[in-house]
Swiss-Prot record:
This is Myb/SANT-like DNA-binding domain-containing protein 3. The gene is Msantd3. Residues 13-78 form the Myb-like domain. It comes from Mus musculus. There is a cross-link at K154 (Glycyl lysine isopeptide (Lys-Gly) (interchain with G-Cter in SUMO2)). It comes from the Eukaryota.
Length: 275
């Protein structure tokens, strides 16, 4: 193979390369998946993709790729994941029994965790089942306590009403209906509050990651400036040493010429006698 021959990268990404790409995207997901579209965010996303490509190419056993190829691969993975999750939602198949998921999607849960807001209406809600059973158990226990209260009321008779008050006592069915309404209204409120906290957490994480990337850029710029100053100082030192060496050679040649014209023995001869 000649030295000037260019090695072309592989056309398709291997499973190892996709895993490395997913790990790096998860590292910078709060910047790469930020919904802001201003010029500063777009420029920051591009610099982040370039940094991601540098980290990707530094990994062993991967083909060299530029940030455009990595970005296109990530967009294809997202589109494929959304399509299969929508198919899963429509067909209502179990996750373990779908051959399409196991053969075409790489780390579906990991990808969906990077896109919580975009896939909110596509993925099936497995987390809601424990809350539903918990509420049902609480309602069942509350109904049992209501039945015991009604039996006690039948056994001991109605409670005496204080004079001067005309408020009727609530029946067991009214108490049960009110409790059920409270449970129904409490669950959506908790879900909305939880979603609001998650969105706030994601925004804070994106802001922190943006700050870290900006601090890293400032640090890299300072290091580059120090390196340039060191190079300039080395160049200045080299020029000074060259000037000093030339001066040294000049005075050595001058000394040799002076020694040839005026040898040392000529100074040892006696002076002639004056008349």
């Amino acid at each position: 193979m000649q030295n000037n021959e260019i090695i072309k990268p592989a056309k398709y990404f291997s499973e190892l390369e996709k895993s490395i790409l997913l790990a790096l995207v998860e590292k910078y997901k709060y910047v790469l998946e930020c919904k802001k579209s201003d010029a500063r965010t777009i420029a920051l996303k591009q610099r982040t993709w370039q940094a991601l490509a540098h980290e990707y190419n530094s990994q062993p056993s991967v083909s060299l790729r530029d940030f455009k190829q990595l970005k296109k691969c990530w967009e294809n993975i997202k589109a494929r994941t959304k399509k299969i999750m929508a198919h899963e939602r429509r067909e209502k198949v179990k996750r373990s029994g779908s051959p399409l998921l196991s053969s075409h999607v790489l780390d579906k849960e990991k990808i969906s965790s990077m896109l919580p807001e975009q896939l909110y209406f596509l993925q099936s809600p497995p987390e809601e089942e424990p809350e539903y059973h918990q509420d049902a158990a609480a309602q069942e226990s509350f109904a049992v306590s209501n039945r015991e209260l009604c039996e006690d009321e039948k056994e001991f008779g109605p409670f005496p009403v204080c004079e001067g008050t005309s408020q009727p006592e609530p029946s067991c069915s009214a108490v049960r209906i009110t409790a059920n309404k409270n449970y129904r209204s409490k669950t959506p409120q908790e879900g909305a509050l939880k979603k609001m906290h998650e969105e706030e957490h994601h925004q804070q994480m994106s802001i922190l990651q943006l700050q870290l990337i900006q601090m890293n850029e400032v640090h890299v710029a300072k290091i580059q400036q120090i390196e340039r100053e060191c190079e300039m100082a080395e160049e200045e030192h080299r020029i000074k040493m060259e000037v000093l060496n030339k001066k040294k050679m000049y005075w050595e040649r001058k000394l040799q010429t002076f020694t040839k014209e005026w040898p040392v023995s000529s100074f040892n001869r006696p002076f002639p006698n004056s008349p």
